[in-house]
């Protein structure tokens, strides 16, 4: 009986820890949608819709993107700062790609994050927390 209680007590104590270590794939994903590419003088402007259905506010959500031309060659590497990313909120961010024609953009790769923090603390596996889509002619993927 004493052994049974000790095991039960150990399980009860570890249960909150298991809940706290839920993986980034659990729960709702942050949606990133490449909505539109617009030609501008000297380049291309991208409109990205961010949908954060979670209760988490991100102080920094800074993307590393690689832009591939229609032939599959990397045209541009971009650091896109998105700060803050508020909980339960949809926002649109624009970023300009100089010296890149919108017609030449074939794919945009979310290669990773330069910085991903919440409450001043680094957030693990930010790439796993997002779901990508595109309404533009270019593919948006990770």
Residue ranges and their predicted role:
Residues 20-44, 49, 136-140:
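Low-complexity, acidic Ser/Thr/Pro/Gly-rich terminal tails and inter-domain linkers that flank the onset
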Residues 99-142:
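Terminal connector regions
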Residues 2-12:
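Bacterial N-terminal signal peptides
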